[in-house]
Amino acid sequence: QGGGPQWAVGHFM
């Protein structure tokens, strides 16, 4: 990816 913590938030939450 590459755009910020947005994708990470979706994965962790």
Curated annotation (Swiss-Prot):
The modification Pyrrolidone carboxylic acid is found at Q1. Keywords: Amidation, Amphibian defense peptide, Pyrrolidone carboxylic acid, Secreted. The keyword Secreted applies. One of its GO terms (cellular component) is extracellular region. It is found in: Secreted. The modification Methionine amide is found at M13. Expressed by the skin glands. Its main location: secreted. Pfam families: Bombesin. One of its GO terms (biological process) is defense response. Belongs to the bombesin/neuromedin-B/ranatensin family. This is Bombesin-like peptide L.
